[in-house]
Swiss-Prot record:
Keywords: Cytoplasm, Hydrolase, NAD, One-carbon metabolism. This is Adenosylhomocysteinase. The keyword Hydrolase applies. InterPro entries: Adenosylhomocyst_ase-like_sf, Adenosylhomocysteinase-like, Ado_hCys_hydrolase_NAD-bd, NAD(P)-bd_dom_sf, S-Ado-L-homoCys_hydrolase_CS. Its EC number is 3.13.2.1. It comes from Bordetella parapertussis (strain 12822 / ATCC BAA-587 / NCTC 13253). Its cofactor is NAD(+). Substrate binds at residues 62, 137, 197, 227, 231.
């Protein structure tokens, strides 16, 4: 891998700085499709609410993320950034941001060793300073500091890695501790809080909080309505099929497509495949989600039933081994298998290691079973929309990243209002604010309640309009 790193110019590791001009041109286009972030820049640029914030960012290094980074910087923050997935970086985006002087450590197709090296680097600030905020996607940056600090006290927590990724992570922590036995606890103590982007990372935060292990306050950005009901649903509805088609050129119409999981992500995936006239089958563990799928006209089955019949498989559960080797052995020749959940273990990719692998092109592999049958595995089981395409469109990411920016401001400027070890969601009025910022771009006009109407339903004229338990 021909990474570019030039300490004399800037602190970065990217694939090719010659791509910076291309990245800058795409950033300019993305800004026109990200009204929420641009409005927040305008609102807060003068007051600089993030002045003094040193943000360690671990989130897909895409063009849209570049607009987020430059928004954080415009509001006064200093930022160091790595991608949260080995395949999701857009190299021209990384180069464009590095060219501005913001440290970026991200290359599309980086190794696991490089991934954890780069995640360490977002916590290695110059002049003896340290990060005081984390912006996370999937929880790896948060995990790294907590696990490393535990290992300082008890190295046996690194004794039994459960996967190849854990083996690499544990080795990286041991190597770091050999250089500096207090590396992790020193940095952990400086963190005011984390804002977490995605479902998987949020699950980790709640688990840590319940166990009393979370060392700072957290804001769950994922469960803002203007994130989960937009990014997860409408974003996946457009980016899933983009990834599958770029990877395989498959005709979706008429095929049987299985979507594992019918949460917000699964709903978007099922809608996209159905819109292209696939026969969509859904697997679910939750009777409520299963009933929703059935009443949308989708066939609800088990993976054991579906494996031998379907042409396309998509995992969207956030769970573990949803598709096993046994399932894949039962599949048709040339079945397409992919994942749109955060981690690569929804599909038992490790269980395929002793099969023959044949790369068709980057992030597209034939996995050949002993009987000669082949399946097409996309992005090695990692996020198909980012591994095989460019992820969600800019507009929907503006909504997600507006939430991230507001959450960073909230947690940094009002840190005393948030209890260490607890996980919070943004209040409803901020959720509604994010939605308002995006209406004009779509030509949408809000109606306004009269005082009498507001009194009749018991809400303020200016909102919030729904109680916290409302599900949208």
């Amino acid at each position: 891998m021909n990474a570019v790193t030039d300490k004399s110019v800037a602190d970065y590791i990217v694939a090719d700085m010659a791509l910076a001009g291309w990245g800058r041109r795409e950033l300019a286009i993305a800004e026109t499709e990200m009204p929420g972030l641009m409005a927040i820049r305008d609102e807060y640029a003068a007051s600089q609410p993030l002045k003094g914030a040193r943000i360690a960012g671990s989130l897909h290094m895409t063009i849209q993320t570049g607009v987020l980074i430059e928004t954080l910087v415009a509001l006064g923050a200093e930022v160091r950034w790595a991608s949260c997935n080995i395949f999701s970086t857009q190299d021209h985006a990384a180069a464009a941001i590095a060219a501005t002087g913001t440290p970026v450590f991200a290359i599309k197709g980086e190794t696991l060793e490089e991934y954890w090296q780069y995640t360490h680097k977002i916590f290695e600030w110059p002049e003896g300073r340290h990060a005081n905020m984390i912006l996370d996607d999937g929880g790896d940056a948060t995990l790294l500091l907590h696990l490393g600090a535990r290992a300082e006290q008890d190295i046996s927590v690194l004794a039994k890695p459960g996967s190849e990724e854990e083996r690499v992570l544990f080795a990286a922590i041991k190597e770091t501790l050999a250089r500096d036995p207090k590396w992790y606890s020193t940095r952990l103590a400086q963190i005011k809080g984390v804002t977490e982007e995605t479902t998987t990372g949020v699950h980790r935060l709640y688990q840590m909080s319940q166990k009393g292990e979370l060392a700072f306050a957290a804001i769950n950005v994922n469960d803002s309505v203007t994130k989960s009901k937009f990014d997860n649903l409408y974003g996946c509805r457009e980016s899933l099929v983009d990834g599958i088609k770029r990877a395989t050129d498959v005709m979706v119409a008429g095929k049987i497509a299985v979507v594992a999981g019918y949460g917000d992500v699964g709903k978007g995936c099922a809608q996209a495949l159905a819109a292209l006239r696939a026969q969509v089958w859904v697997t679910e563990i939750d009777p409520i989600c299963a009933l929703q799928a059935a009443m949308e006209g989708f066939k609800v089955v088990t993976m054991e039933e579906a494996a031998a019949h379907a042409d396309i498989f998509v995992t969207a559960t956030g769970n573990y081994h949803v598709i096993t080797r046994q399932h894949m052995e039962a599949m048709k020749d040339q079945a397409i298998v992919c994942n749109i959940g955060h981690f690569d273990n929804e599909i038992d990719v490790a269980g395929l290691e002793n099969c023959q692998w044949e790369e068709i092109k980057p992030q597209v592999d034939h996995v050949i079973f002993p009987d000669g049958k082949r399946i097409i595995l996309l992005a090695k089981g990692r996020l198909v929309n980012l591994g095989c395409a460019t992820g969600h469109p800019s507009f929907v990411m503006s909504s997600s990243f507006a939430n991230q920016t507001i959450a960073q401001i909230e947690l940094f400027t009002r840190n005393e209002a948030y209890t260490t070890g607890q996980v919070y969601v943004l209040p409803k009025h901020l959720d509604e604010k994010v939605a308002r910022l995006h209406l004009k771009k779509l030509g949408a006009k809000l109606s306004t309640l009269s005082k009498q109407q507001a009194d009749y339903i018991g809400v303020p004229v200016e909102g919030p309009f729904k109680p916290g338990h409302y599900r949208y």
